[in-house]
């Protein structure tokens, strides 16, 4: 197995573990892990040399970029929202926002698949700052770092002398989902009652 395929396999395992650890009521988180995991599973095939997997890997990567990261943000920022807790709402969201992202990428607005994850990463980071979650903040930093690597690193550059851009993206995403998946949800403070 080559290093790119191995990095996607690590991401797949991280998504599966994070989805497994999450309680039943967090449908948005599990949906996000499913989308990222599907992209990673097909990526393992792609980077293992199966040419037919290139198209499906690109498709699921764009779908995950447009929907999975917002689902992660919703799961941690608004845990009581129907989108965070209901699988049917997650399915509709993936079809609508993911479909919009796929369509946008096909008509030349490929930036959409970069802006949506970036905004969701900022929402996640702000949420972790507000919740004072050290694990969540580290996970948010790893998530933002993965986007920075994907957007700015040249494909042939070795990062830290060990990883190419693809591998760094996958390992940072794996770290992010493992850390963010461990965040304990705090209920939003109710109006009229001071927070304890």
Residue ranges, per PLM feature:
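Membrane-interfacial loop-to-transmembrane alpha-helix junctions, especially the N-terminal start
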Residues: 24-36, 81-93, 132-143, 190-196
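Hydrophobic core segments of alpha-helical transmembrane domains in multi-pass membrane proteins
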Residues: 32-36, 113-123, 138-144, 167-173
